[in-house]
Amino acid sequence: MSQDVNELSKQPTPDKAEDNAFFPSPYSLSQYTAPKTDFDGVEHKGAYKDGKWKVLMIAAEERYVLLENGKMFSTGNHPVEMLLPLHHLMEAGFDVDVATLSGYPVKLELWAMPTEDEAVISTYNKLKEKLKQPKKLADVIKNELGPDSDYLSVFIPGGHAAVVGISESEDVQQTLDWALDNDRFIVTLCHGPAALLSAGINREKSPLEGYSVCVFPDSLDEGANIEIGYLPGRLKWLVADLLTKQGLKVVNDDMTGRTLKDRKLLTGDSPLASNELGKLAVNEMLNAIQNK
């Protein structure tokens, strides 16, 4: 007989690979994960056939987020937030390159993998080798960025690991500068917009000041995520709060699957936005190619 959801523990689960580190509680996973997503088909299968334009994904290589109380959250990139948007992009005909800050393997929250979702699982299997052996972002900047680069968009998936390193990386700053200067897309969701903070490093103001974004609500990281044991403590800083302080406009305070386009910046509020953000990115990229 299956266990009643209300009987599941709200205590975070210890991660035995690291001192004082924790996975989300069983109860929180029952609320936040599912075997399938809301994927409802690809709208533009094979629509892009020329083979030039690609997507550069900046993924997380660090698993642990140190919290205010000294505990660590065992995280990574959220598999739905990464793989469902990429499924739409790859099925439309765009190749994907994977980079991390140091070239170390990508870390994923496998506990959030929708194991019965063919779209997500098939994309994971196609990308697994690149996820294990990604490019080093500094090498991409040196060798593959410029006005003639083949990258049409930069994609930064979420998961709490996006708050570690990426938000204060000068390499990420250079990549975002390149995207803005060369009229390329920046696509990100949930905690991924933490990467946008890098644009303001050592500057009086961020080049993204005035842009509107969707982002994971700070209120959940401060409240429900702790109460149900998803997080084992409070984050040292909050994504929407710091984005607002850099002059960006956060348009949501809840988690509904909302997406937003502001110029070439495409954002989503949570894993619930993954499917629609993938569709939005494909539509915008195809339109941009037609108008080039």
Swiss-Prot record:
Q: Which UniProt keywords apply?
A: Cytoplasm, DNA damage, DNA repair, Hydrolase, Stress response
Annotated region described as Disordered, given as residue ranges? 1-23
Which coarse location class describes where this protein primarily resides? cytoplasm
Question: What GO annotations for molecular function exist for this entry?
Answer: glyoxalase III activity; protein deglycase activity; thiolester hydrolase activity
Keyword field contains Hydrolase: yes
Q: Offer a single GO CC term for the protein.
A: cytoplasm
Please cite one Gene Ontology biological process associated with this protein. protein repair
* Coiled coil feature spans: none
Stretches with biased composition (Polar residues): 1-12
Indicate the secretion signal residues: none
List, alphabetically, the SUPFAM superfamilies matched.
Class I glutamine amidotransferase-like (SSF52317)
Domain of life where this protein originates: Bacteria
The EC number of this protein is 3.1.2.-, 3.5.1.-, 3.5.1.124
Reactions the enzyme catalyzes = N(omega)-(1-hydroxy-2-oxopropyl)-L-arginyl-[protein] + H2O = lactate + L-arginyl-[protein] + H(+); N(6)-(1-hydroxy-2-oxopropyl)-L-lysyl-[protein] + H2O = lactate + L-lysyl-[protein] + H(+); S-(1-hydroxy-2-oxopropyl)-L-cysteinyl-[protein] + H2O = lactate + L-cysteinyl-[protein] + H(+); N(omega)-(1-hydroxy-2-oxoethyl)-L-arginyl-[protein] + H2O = L-arginyl-[protein] + glycolate + H(+)
Q: Where in the cell is it found?
A: Cytoplasm
Active site per database record: C190 (nucleophile)
Q: What does this protein do?
A: Protein and nucleotide deglycase that catalyzes the deglycation of the Maillard adducts formed between amino groups of proteins or nucleotides and reactive carbonyl groups of glyoxals. Thus, functions as a protein deglycase that repairs methylglyoxal- and glyoxal-glycated proteins, and releases repaired proteins and lactate or glycolate, respectively. Deglycates cysteine, arginine and lysine residues in proteins, and thus reactivates these proteins by reversing glycation by glyoxals.
Q: Which HAMAP family match?
A: Deglycase_HchA
Q: What family, per the record?
A: Belongs to the peptidase C56 family. HchA subfamily.
Q: What is the name of the protein in this document?
A: Protein/nucleic acid deglycase HchA
According to its UniProt entry, this protein's organism is: Staphylococcus aureus (strain Newman)
Its gene name is hchA
